[in-house]
């Protein structure tokens, strides 16, 4: 079917561009740049991710109502707001993917991925640090969207188990980003938890890995739970604006 083939191609190209952008972050000079547009390398990474996000939006044009195509922007705004509120705390969670989870449940995996990328593009328009974590946002959007399509979030136990699985996956990816893009030295996050693990194991890199896994697992369980609760108890007058055939259940 030609109508679906070109959509799949755009999604595949978008993911490939995102991976290419991440590959650019493993060069040593990337970790030394703070402001995105002060370096050709970080500016190129940002541009690749922007193109990838546009391709994801384009792949869904005509497939969902036009109003739903705007949801990733609102989801990204939620991510940035909640993320900025928690980034300076020592709480071992981030809450910067709640918007991604909400949109992925409503609109499916592709627009969930678009929400994750939009968050990265907007958040990385000035600070280059966030750009390296683009694959994590894509993974979360895709995973939540696919699980939602299979009705996994209808039971609390499955919500928790799904959050654990997504947390482990995103945690492993985040650890790889920290090691390869930033030589194992995060610039933000719950440093007290990292110091706690380092005190116990006397190994800085192991402490960073354990902190990343712990934080991501806890964060994603609560992220999915919050997203499901928001949609479950959304007033009907609002819910009817985003309820369509494929997400009615």
Protein language model features and the residues they cover:
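Membrane-interface helix-boundary motifs at transmembrane edges
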Residues: 2-3, 57-67, 147-158
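Membrane-embedded alpha-helical hairpins and interfacial helices in multi-pass inner-membrane proteins
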Residues: 2-50, 83-90, 130-132, 152-249
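Membrane-interfacial loop-to-transmembrane alpha-helix junctions, especially the N-terminal start
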Residues: 6-11, 64-71, 110-112
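Histidine- and aromatic-rich ligand-binding microenvironments
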Residues: 8-11, 51, 57-62, 140-148
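Helix-loop-helix hairpins and the membrane-proximal interhelical loops
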Residues: 50-77
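Alpha-helical membrane-protein architecture signal
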Residues: 70, 74, 78, 99, ...
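Small-residue-rich segments of transmembrane alpha-helices in multi-pass membrane proteins
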Residues: 74-76, 104-106, 165-173
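Alpha-helical membrane segments and adjacent membrane-interface helices in multi-pass membrane proteins
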Residues: 76-148, 158
């Amino acid at each position: 079917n030609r109508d679906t083939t070109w959509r799949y191609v755009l999604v595949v190209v978008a993911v490939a561009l995102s991976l290419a952008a991440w590959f650019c972050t493993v060069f040593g000079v990337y970790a030394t740049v703070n402001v995105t547009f002060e370096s050709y390398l970080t500016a190129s990474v940002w541009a690749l991710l922007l193109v990838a996000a546009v391709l994801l939006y384009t792949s869904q044009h005509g497939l969902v109502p036009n109003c739903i195509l705007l949801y990733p922007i609102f989801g990204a705004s939620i991510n940035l707001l909640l993320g900025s509120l928690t980034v300076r705390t020592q709480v071992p969670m981030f809450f910067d993917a709640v918007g991604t989870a909400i949109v992925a449940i409503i609109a499916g995996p592709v627009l969930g991925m678009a929400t994750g990328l939009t968050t990265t593009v907007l958040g990385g328009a000035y600070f280059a640090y966030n750009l390296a974590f683009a694959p994590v946002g894509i993974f979360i959007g895709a995973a939540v969207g696919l699980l939602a399509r299979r009705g996994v979030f209808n039971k609390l136990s499955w919500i928790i188990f799904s959050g654990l699985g997504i947390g482990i996956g995103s945690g492993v990816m985040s650890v790889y980003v920290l090691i390869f893009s930033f030589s194992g030295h995060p610039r933000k996050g719950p440093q007290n938890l990292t110091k706690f693990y380092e005190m116990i194991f006397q190994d800085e890199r192991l402490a960073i890995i354990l902190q990343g896994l712990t934080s991501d697992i806890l964060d994603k369980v609560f992220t999915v739970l919050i997203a499901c609760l928001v949609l479950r108890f959304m007033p009907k007058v609002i819910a009817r604006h985003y309820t369509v055939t494929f997400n009615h259940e």
